[in-house]
């Protein structure tokens, strides 16, 4: 029997958190090896573990996978969270990319210079309420089903619900006009494996604060 997947990243959200969410939702236990200093990253680079000299990296099924989308695709396929045919996978990809676009803006927000934060937050709010959330609300409204694609839980639902938690952290009022998305969030959050991941003490990471940013700066030298 194969061992648990091992996740190599720093002890924060960043680009690994969507991978943690997907594994947790699939009910897969995983281990984490945190990169705590530049030497830890250098060791992974020097031993050939990082194809493109960067993390996230996940050891799974005898492979050392890098590139977030490749990792997510593999996990989603392995654990049957990627639709039943090509058309469903195309929709799942399209929705997941939309989630990633807004998620990227939110992920970079804590790195904003203080003078730019208000303008950035205004932009995120505008994109959230006028572009991204209405699009996903309309998908659910158009077919009246419980999940985005094929009336079955997929990676798109998991990525979207993760994003909704981040939106709520920024400003809970942003979800007010999207009842179907709030219902999806509640539905996915009540899946036993996800419910467990949302409990205190799980491997879910807290919001990024100044301390985490400084830790990441030291490791990744940005």
Curated annotation (Swiss-Prot):
InterPro entries: Glutathione-S-Trfase_C-like, Glutathione-S-Trfase_C_sf, Glutathione_S-Trfase, Glutathione_S-Trfase_N, GST_alpha, GST_C, GST_superfamily, Thioredoxin-like_sf. Keywords: Acetylation, Cytoplasm, Isomerase, Lipid metabolism, Oxidoreductase, Peroxidase, Transferase. Signal peptide: none annotated. The modification N-acetylmethionine is found at residue 1. GO terms for molecular function: glutathione transferase activity; peroxidase activity; steroid Delta-isomerase activity. Disulfide bonds: none annotated. The keyword Isomerase applies. GO terms for biological process: glutathione derivative biosynthetic process; glutathione metabolic process; prostaglandin metabolic process; xenobiotic metabolic process. It is found in: Cytoplasm. Gene3D superfamilies: 1.20.1050.10, Glutaredoxin. The modification N6-succinyllysine is found at residue 4. Transmembrane segments: none annotated. Residues 3-83 form the GST N-terminal domain. Expressed in corpus luteum, adrenal gland, testis, liver, lung, thyroid and kidney. SUPFAM superfamilies: GST C-terminal domain-like (SSF47616), Thioredoxin-like (SSF52833). One of its GO terms (cellular component) is cytosol. It catalyses: RX + glutathione = an S-substituted glutathione + a halide anion + H(+); prostaglandin A2 + glutathione = prostaglandin A2-S-(R)-glutathione; prostaglandin J2 + glutathione = prostaglandin J2-S-(R)-glutathione; (13S)-hydroperoxy-(9Z,11E)-octadecadienoate + 2 glutathione = (13S)-hydroxy-(9Z,11E)-octadecadienoate + glutathione disulfide + H2O. Glutathione S-transferase that catalyzes the nucleophilic attack of the sulfur atom of glutathione on the electrophilic groups of a wide range of exogenous and endogenous compounds. Involved in the formation of glutathione conjugates of both prostaglandin A2 (PGA2) and prostaglandin J2 (PGJ2). It also catalyzes the isomerization of D5-androstene-3,17-dione (AD) into D4-androstene-3,17-dione and may therefore play an important role in hormone biosynthesis. This is Glutathione S-transferase A1. The lineage of its organism: Eukaryota, Metazoa, Chordata, Craniata, Vertebrata.
């Amino acid at each position: 029997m194969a061992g648990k997947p091992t996740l190599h990243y720093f002890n924060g959200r960043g680009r690994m958190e969507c991978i943690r969410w997907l594994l947790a939702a699939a009910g897969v236990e995983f281990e984490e090896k945190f990169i705590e200093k530049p030497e830890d990253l250098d060791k992974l680079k020097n031993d050939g573990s990082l194809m493109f000299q960067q993390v996230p990296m996940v050891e799974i099924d005898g492979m050392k996978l890098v590139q977030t989308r490749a990792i997510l695709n593999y996990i989603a396929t392995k654990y049957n969270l990627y639709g039943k045919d090509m058309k469903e996978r195309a929709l799942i990809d399209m929705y997941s990319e939309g989630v990633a676009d807004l998620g990227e803006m939110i992920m970079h927000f804590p790195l904003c210079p203080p003078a730019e934060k208000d303008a950035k937050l205004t932009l995120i709010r505008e994109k959230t309420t006028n572009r991204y959330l209405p699009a996903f609300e309309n998908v659910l409204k158009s077919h009246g089903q419980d999940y985005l694609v094929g009336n079955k839980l997929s990676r798109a639902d998991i990525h979207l619900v993760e994003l909704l938690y981040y939106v709520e952290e920024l400003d809970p009022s942003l979800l007010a006009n999207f009842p179907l998305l709030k219902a999806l969030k509640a539905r996915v959050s009540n899946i036993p494996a996800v419910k467990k991941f949302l409990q205190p003490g799980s491997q879910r990471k807290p919001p990024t604060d100044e301390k985490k940013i400084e830790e990441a700066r030291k490791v990744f030298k940005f």
